[in-house]
């Protein structure tokens, strides 16, 4: 049969897990206390078989408000938030292999792309999709979700 494990993390603390020692067929749910306190209906990330799936991230400041300054500022803050989350999980931007960028206006694509490239090694750019859609959280101009390899 399957050797599976489900664990829940709040901050850095394991809340629930079973005795499985295999990383295959496992799901790890990762949330910060801030995410829980704000009542968001999703995990910040899940880890499945060594792959990190980050939920869509927008350019929020630590207090939860959206940064001012347009698409460039939002792109920088969004990617800074992604970088910080990966670092808390023991990873880095070099571990990202796929990004999906959702823009409220596709005309912002060139400026978003200029800022986006600053966060990655030019020799290791992740695969990427980008599209326009309306109704991003908090009226954001950009939302990015990523997949990364968990190295530890």
Residue ranges and their predicted role:
Residues 2-80, 84-89, 94, 103-152:
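N-terminal presequence-like segments and the immediate start of the first folded domain
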Residues 97-99:
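Surface-exposed aromatic
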């Amino acid at each position: 049969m399957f050797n599976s494990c489900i664990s829940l993390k709040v901050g850095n603390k394991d809340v629930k897990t079973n005795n499985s020692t295999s990383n295959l067929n496992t799901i790890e749910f990762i949330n910060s206390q801030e995410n829980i306190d704000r009542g968001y209906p999703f995990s910040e990330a899940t880890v499945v078989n060594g792959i990190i799936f980050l939920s869509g991230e927008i350019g929020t400041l630590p207090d939860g408000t959206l940064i001012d300054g347009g698409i460039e500022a939002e792109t920088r803050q969004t990617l800074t938030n992604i970088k910080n989350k990966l670092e808390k999980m023991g990873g880095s931007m070099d571990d990202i292999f796929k990004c999906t960028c959702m823009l409220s206006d596709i005309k912002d694509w060139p400026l978003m792309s200029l800022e986006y490239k600053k966060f990655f090694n030019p020799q290791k750019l992740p695969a990427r999709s980008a599209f326009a859609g309306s109704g991003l959280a908090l009226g954001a101009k950009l939302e990015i979700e990523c997949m990364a390899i968990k190295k530890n």
